Structure formats: C-alpha cells, structure tokens
A protein has these predicted regions:
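SDR active-site strand-loop-helix element
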Residues: 4, 28, 66-67, 101-107, ...
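Oxidoreductase cofactor-interface core, primarily capturing Rossmann-like NAD(P)-dependent enzymes
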Residues: 14, 20-21, 37, 111-223
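Conserved glycine-rich Rossmann-like NAD(P)H-binding loop of the short-chain dehydrogenase/reductase
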Residues: 23-30
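NAD(P)H-binding glycine-rich loop region in Rossmannoid oxidoreductase-like domains
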Residues: 33-95, 106-113
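Conserved cofactor-binding/catalytic machinery of classical short-chain dehydrogenase/reductase
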Residues: 49, 85-88, 100, 123-124, ...
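A short helix->loop->beta-strand "cap" motif at the edges of active sites that frequently abuts
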Residues: 95-100, 132-133
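Mid/C-terminal beta-alpha module of Rossmann-like enzyme folds, strongest
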Residues: 186-251, 265-299
Length: 299
C-alpha cells in the first residue's frame, strides 16, 4: 500500500498499523521520515510532480491520500492541495491498476461553502471520485490524540489563562474522534474483500457543544476557568494575525469550521458499519492529563 502524507498526523499511524497487519507500506512525504521502521519504505517525493506520483503508486494494491493543508503558503493553496493534487494521485492510482483508493477529507466538506478551505474539501472529493470511480471518501470529525494540535492546545491555554475566550456562543456541535480509530477504519477498508461504501463519516461516541467540550477538558484537568464568549468576527481578525506565525495556534479556516456543526450523519456508514467501537475523548484526555497534573508542561 502507498500512503501519501505518510508522516502526517493520520498517515504516520496508518503506515505503522498497515505494517503491523503484514502489509508492505510506502510512506510518501516531502521529507523522508526520520524513523527507519522495519517494513515501511519512507520515500521523499513531491506529490505535485506527476512522475513522482506515478512511481509512488506503481504496483500498489491500495493507495491512500492523507495529505491536508490548514494554512495556505507559497504555491500551496487549499485548491492546489485538496483538489488538484488529490485528483493527480487518484488518476495515477487508477492508471496503475490500484484495486482500492481511499481519500481522507473531513466532515463538513461542502462545494457550496463560502470558506475556501471547506469548499476545497468538497471539490476535492468530487475530483477524486471523477478521477477514480469507486474511490472511498473518509470524512473524519476533528481528530484528537496526545500529540494533536487540538486537545493539547486547548489544555495549554486553559492552564495558562484564568479567563478562556470561546468561539461565538459556544453552541457549535462537535463529535471528536480518536485519530488511531480513523487509521484503523482506513486499514479495514483497504483489507476487506467486499466492496466498501463510497463515503464513511467517522466520529467519536459523544456529541458536545463547544462549551461542553471545554468544560469537560477543564474538569478532567482539575481546572475551573471563566469562559468568555467572543464574536466570530473577533476570532477571524485574530486568526489572520496568528497565521503570520511559523506555527499558528489557530487559523481562519478553523474559525470558519467552528461556525458549523461537525457531527457524523446518521444516514452515512461509519464506525459501526466497520465493527469498530471508537475510543472516547474522556479516556484519551485522562492519559494526556495524568502526567501533567503536577504542573509538567505538555510538549
């Protein structure tokens, strides 16, 4: 199997899980992975380059596109990465005779959205399905883990700020999903013999309002912050400034995502269809918070 974005948040977990299942794996990224995992071939390649893509998918039974972009910079735009590059990989996989192609998108993807990020996700899905008929689209909710940029950022800010500003009225609904469960779902889809569904929406076992999520994190961490509601216009302006930083704490596209509910559709298949019981946010939070309750800073 070939995994594009093989050193990313989802990709690095996926390649190890595939390896552990006895599958030979190529992990494709712009920079060769530092780890020399047995059974994983790390390849430095530019997914924008047609020849590099063709070489990467050659002979692969399954191909996964897990490349994503959260901040536009240089020649990398949401459209170029989520639509053009995704379609290029899908076409190359089809021409190479790949049996199964999986494209990682996101819940909320919508071609009619005014947000360039959300719209590009929807357009990317359509481009992939055209380039590789029978492609499987994976739409995860916001993903979490001990090394994420979601829970850990919130926890750091809750620890450092006596008053915590929240997006809008705090009523936006989220259904966070453990990233390892997403990797497990993709692995199962690649391995299963029967024809998969065209779209899966993967979300955790509980739906939270944004305010409920913050209070849950604070409670498990033993914190009692004051929550301040601030309008989305304020957040958008602040995010524009934050994006100038090398590693922005949040971006304008994340602000746009916080305006819409990102919960799994009851009409689309998900973890239950695959026989997977997703891990709860509370379980992972306990693991993140436990070594930090004595004041040890998260890395």
């Amino acid at each position: 199997a070939t995994v594009f974005g093989g050193t990313g948040f989802v990709g690095r977990r996926l390649v190890r899980l595939l390896r552990d299942c006895g599958i030979r794996v190529r992990a494709i990224s712009r920079h060769r992975g530092l780890s020399q995992d047995a059974g994983i071939e790390h390849i430095a390649a530019d997914a924008r380059d047609q020849r590099s893509v063709e070489a990467a998918v050659d002979g692969a039974d399954g191909v996964v596109n897990a490349i994503s972009l959260f901040v536009q910079h240089g020649g990398d735009t949401f459209y170029s990465v989520h639509v053009e590059t995704a379609a290029k990989i899908a076409r190359a996989a089809r021409q190479a005779g790949t049996r199964r192609f999986v494209h990682v998108s996101g819940i909320g993807a919508n071609t009619a959205s005014s947000s360039p990020y959300i719209r590009s996700r929807g357009e990317g899905e359509a481009a992939v399905q055209t380039a590789f008929p029978g492609a499987v689209i994976i739409r995860p909710a916001v993903m979490f883990a001990s090394d994420d940029a979601f829970l850990t950022t919130i926890l750091r800010l809750l620890r450092s700020m006596p008053a915590y500003p929240i997006f809008g009225d705090g009523k936006t609904r989220l259904q966070p999903v453990y990233v390892n469960d997403v990797a497990a779902a993709i692995t199962q889809i690649l391995r299963q013999g029967q024809k998969p569904y065209p779209i899966y929406e993967l979300a955790g076992p509980r739906v939270y309002s944004y305010e409920e999520l913050l209070r849950t994190i604070a409670h498990i961490a033993g914190l009692r912050p004051v929550l301040m509601r601030l309008p989305f216009a304020f957040w958008s302006a602040l995010a524009g400034v934050a994006e100038m930083l090398p590693q922005p704490p949040f971006t304008r596209n994340q602000v746009e995502l916080m305006k819409i509910d990102t919960t799994a559709s009851k009409s689309l298949p998900g973890f239950r269809t695959l026989g997977i019981s997703p891990r709860s946010l509370e379980d992972e939070l306990e693991a993140i918070v436990r070594p930090n309750k004595q004041g040890v800073l998260l890395r």
